[in-house]
Structure formats: C-alpha cells, structure tokens
C-alpha cells in the first residue's frame, strides 16, 4: 500500500473580471502559444462588443450561446468485425460544454471579419439567437447520431 497521501482535486480557476468558470474555459481554448493575457484581451473585447450589440449582460449571452451549442449525443468510431461503425454515445455536461466551446471558437475563426474579438462576438450572438455555424455543427452531429441509431448496441 502506498504511503503517499491522496492528491487534492484541482478546481478550475475563475477569471478576474467575470468570476466565471465558463469564461476561464473559453480563455484557455482561445489561448495560443501561451499568450494568456492576449486571450483575455480578445475575450473581454468580444464581451464589450456583445454588450454594445445586444444591450444585455454579455455573460448571459455567453451562457445562452454555450447552452444552445452543447450537444446531448455524439458519434464515436468503433471498429467491429473489420468495419468501422459510427456509434452514438451520450455526452456528459462537462464534455458537452468543452465541445460547444471548441465548436464556437472554430466557427468564429472561420468567419470573415476584422479581428478575433469581432468574429467571436458575432458568433456568440448568433449562437444565442439559434443560428450560426456552431449551431449547424451541433445539428449535424445530432443528425449523424440519429442516422446511426442502429449501431447504438455496440456501446
């Protein structure tokens, strides 16, 4: 038996301004080459633009956007008897949020526009309204899962 103590579970830190874990998750996904201050700058500018566009709390728009993009089910490739099947699997809340954030950032990076803050704010507002590339990605994933429902027993 090991004599070492059990490791303490790390809790995700919240950001200095909004004190929100979702904001921190988003910043960590925006982050490139270790430039965290730049990632914070991009997100805060995007939040300011959301405030100007919608005249509502940008944090509630962010929550609504992530809630709208979060998938309930996804497909996972599973090799059975020499052929690969797309098997639908349920997704937990944390993994779903992580996927939603990844899709939102991917969609905003693909958008044409001036800078990342502008593109991110536009994508978040669109996702909160129920449109945009990230929402399309979620619907496509759900369609794939529905189409491959016959393989659900391979889980």
From Swiss-Prot:
Keyword Ribonucleoprotein: yes
Gene Ontology cellular component terms for the protein in this record: chloroplast; small ribosomal subunit
Signal peptide: none
Xref: Gene3D superfamilies: Ribosomal protein S7 domain
PROSITE patterns in alphabetical order: RIBOSOMAL_S7
GO molecular function annotations of the record: rRNA binding; structural constituent of ribosome
Domain of life: Eukaryota
Localization of this protein: Plastid, Chloroplast
CDD domains the record matches: uS7_Chloroplast
Disulfide bonds: none
A Gene Ontology biological process term: translation
Keywords in alphabetical order: Chloroplast, Plastid, Ribonucleoprotein, Ribosomal protein, RNA-binding, rRNA-binding
Coiled coil: none
One Pfam family named in its UniProt record: Ribosomal_S7
InterPro entries: Ribosomal_uS7, Ribosomal_uS7_bac/org-type, Ribosomal_uS7_CS, Ribosomal_uS7_dom, Ribosomal_uS7_dom_sf
Protein task: One of the primary rRNA binding proteins, it binds directly to 16S rRNA where it nucleates assembly of the head domain of the 30S subunit.
Subunit structure: Part of the 30S ribosomal subunit.
Protein family per UniProt: Belongs to the universal ribosomal protein uS7 family.
Protein name: Small ribosomal subunit protein uS7c
Organism: Euonymus alatus
Gene, per the UniProt record: rps7
């Amino acid at each position: 038996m090991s004599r070492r103590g059990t490791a303490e579970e790390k809790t995700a830190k919240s950001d200095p301004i909004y004190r929100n874990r979702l904001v921190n998750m988003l910043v960590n996904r925006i982050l490139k080459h270790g430039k965290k201050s730049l990632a914070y700058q991009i997100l805060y500018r995007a939040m300011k633009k959301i405030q100007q566009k919608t005249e509502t709390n940008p944090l509630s728009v962010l929550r609504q956007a992530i809630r709208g993009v979060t998938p309930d089910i996804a497909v996972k490739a599973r090799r059975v008897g020499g052929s690969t099947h797309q098997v639908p699997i349920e997704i937990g809340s944390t993994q779903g949020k992580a996927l939603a954030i990844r899709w939102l950032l991917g969609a905003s990076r693909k958008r044409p526009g001036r800078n990342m803050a502008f593109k991110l704010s536009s994508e978040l507002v669109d996702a909160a309204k129920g449109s945009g590339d990230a929402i399309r990605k979620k619907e496509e994933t759900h369609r794939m899962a529905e189409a491959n429902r016959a393989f659900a027993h391979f889980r």
